[in-house]
Each structure stands twice: as C-alpha cells, then as structure tokens.
Amino acid sequence: MRCYYVLIAIAAVLSGIATAAADSRHNKLAAVDSDKTTDRVELFLRRNDELDAENTDERIVAGAIPLNARIIKRLVKLEKKMVDPKLADDLLEGTTLKTELDAALPYAGRTQVFERWHAQGLDPSSITKAVNIHPAIEKKYRIVYMMYELFVKSADKKRLAKLKRKRTND
C-alpha cells in the first residue's frame, strides 16, 4: 500500500515539473537592474571604505611614512638596558630584599623561603609590589612572585582540607 503512495507522489512531482518547464513564463530571462545590484553588493562588502576612490587618493597623496632606523635602534637599545638583569642587581645591591629574592630564585631553596614568608604572614601582593618597583627587577624576579602566589594558594587549600577533615572526624 505504501509503495502505491510513493509512486503516486513521484508521478505528481514529475508531472508538475514537466508542466513548469513547458510554461513560457519560466523560459524568459529577467533584465538586471544595475543600480540595485551594486547596492546589494556594497551591502555585503566588509570594507566599503577601502574600495572608495576618494580615500585611496588621499592615501596616495600622503605617501609612505619614512622610518628612521637610527632612532628605532636607539629605542631598542634603551629598552634592553631598562630590563637588563645586571641593572636589577645594581638597584638592589646591599638590600635584604635582594638576598631574600636571590634565595628564592633556585628551585631547591624556593619552598623553604616561601614557607618562611608564609609563616611571617607575608602577602603575595606585597611581594609583587616590591618586585614591580622597576622593570629590570620585575623581569629578573617575576618567577618568584608568581610562584609565591601559587604556593600561598596551595597552602591555603591544604589548610582548608585539614580543617574539613577534622570536622568530619569529630
């Protein structure tokens, strides 16, 4: 029974297609209105302003911006001097902050220094503020304040876990 319905539906579709093709209205081509099509194309362009002739004329008249390589090299050298680790050593020479930060730099002594700081109640933001005094100091000791912040977070999580275990055991 279902097969008959399928055959009837296919025959109806095919007869509709055949009559549509035979109809003379469908064989005529419509004229293209050029003004409307350009408006439609401009709607879909992402950057109409770049294709505008007036803007390109202004860019051509202005010309390329000349780059002064000597000034650029001088600025790059100045920037490298600003973040030089030797400058950080010179700035912190003879301070207790330098000895503490130098002790926290190697991986082996880092946890002992962090535990001492945490026991003293040092906040990670205070270490961050002390290190961010100068770009050279920040570059050299960035790992210290980042690792100390992570150390404090993990120590706080461990402390909370112990408190929760203690509550559940009581």
From Swiss-Prot:
Pfam families: RXLR. The keyword Secreted applies. Keywords: Host nucleus, Secreted, Signal. Residues 1-22 form the signal peptide. It is found in: Secreted; Host nucleus. It comes from the Eukaryota. A motif (RxLR-dEER) lies at residues 43-59. Effector that enhances P.infestans colonization of Nicotiana benthamiana leaves, which suggests that PITG_22798 contributes to P.infestans infection. Triggers cell death in Nicotiana benthamiana. PITG_22798-triggered cell death is dependent on SGT1-mediated signaling but not HSP90, and is suppressed by the P.infestans avirulence effector 3b (AVR3b). Belongs to the RxLR effector family. This is RxLR effector protein PITG_22798.
